[in-house]
Swiss-Prot record:
Null mutant phenotype: Reduced number of lateral roots.
Span list, region Disordered: 162-183
Organism: Arabidopsis thaliana (Mouse-ear cress)
Biological function: Transcriptional activator. Involved in lateral root formation. Regulated by the transcriptional activators ARF7 and ARF19. Functions in the initiation and emergence of lateral roots, in conjunction with LBD18, downstream of ARF7 and ARF19. Acts downstream of the auxin influx carriers AUX1 and LAX1 in the regulation of lateral root initiation and development.
Assembly description: Homodimer and heterodimer with LBD18.
Protein name per its UniProtKB record: LOB domain-containing protein 16
Length: 245
């Protein structure tokens, strides 16, 4: 696109593309020579001339600083091509299409941000629910007690002795409990001895003549029962004396 100072393309002596299209002699100070080459400038300048006119473009470039004229020529050529492609909107149609694309992309960005926020909120809610469930489970473990363990860990069982079935309206002392125990034992032994003696006299066992029980041939049974009763009486008397002391 560069041309020599005399208005002709360097090394060829041909006019610039604009002058070639206009079929005129290219002057040394041609304003179009630096921007329209002799080979490809004619077709490019044709669209500009058809839309804006050569004289109008020349006046426009004269009002633009030299260091900005190249960019001005590029934009003028773009506007001319857009106007030929779309006589109604020209380059505005391209601008409108780009604006629609920007708006569509912005809406997609907003949707993605909303989805991300929703996922973050859901994740935070799940984490909070999991934490609350864990805390409730740990609290339940700390406060819950096994029924068997509680039955054997009460203060009463640790510190209170067991005296059998005690009536709260009639408390029993250890001495009276021991006396009752010896009395029950003595009465049981006496009852057993009487039963054995009765069946021994009748000639049969505990369950009759043919049953299983204490049969004849054991004359020392009554004697051993008497010894046992006397021993229990002595033990009972000794225990009572020890408790009184």
């Amino acid at each position: 696109m560069a041309s020599s100072g005399n208005g002709t393309t360097a090394g060829t002596g041909s006019p610039c593309g604009a002058c070639k299209f206009l079929r005129r002699k290219c002057a040394s100070d041609c304003i179009f020579a630096p921007y329209f080459s002799s080979e490809q400038g004619a077709a490019r300048f044709a669209a500009i001339h058809k839309v804006f006119g050569a004289s109008n473009v020349s006046k426009l470039l004269l009002n633009v600083p030299i260091h900005d004229r190249c960019e001005a020529v590029v934009t003028i050529a773009y506007e001319a091509q857009a106007r030929l492609h779309d006589p109604v909107y020209g380059c505005v149609s391209h601008i409108f299409a780009l604006q629609q694309q920007v708006a569509f992309l912005q809406s997609q960005v907003m949707q993605m941000k909303a989805q991300i926020a929703g996922h973050q909120t859901s994740a935070a809610g799940d984490l909070r629910h999991s934490s609350e469930s864990t805390n409730q489970f740990m609290t339940w473990q700390q406060t819950s007690v096994s029924p068997i363990g509680s039955a054997y860990s009460t203060p009463y069982n640790h510190h209170q002795p067991y005296y059998g079935h005690v009536n709260p309206n009639n408390p029993v002392s250890p001495q009276s409990s021991l006396e009752e125990s010896f009395s029950n034992t003595s009465s049981d032994v006496t009852t057993t001895a009487n039963v054995r003696e009765t069946h021994h006299q009748t000639g049969g066992g505990v369950y009759g003549h043919d049953g299983i029980g204490f049969h004849e041939g054991y004359p020392n049974k009554k004697r051993s029962v008497s010894y046992c009763s006397s021993d229990l009486g002595e033990l009972q008397a000794l225990a009572l004396r020890m408790m009184k002391n």
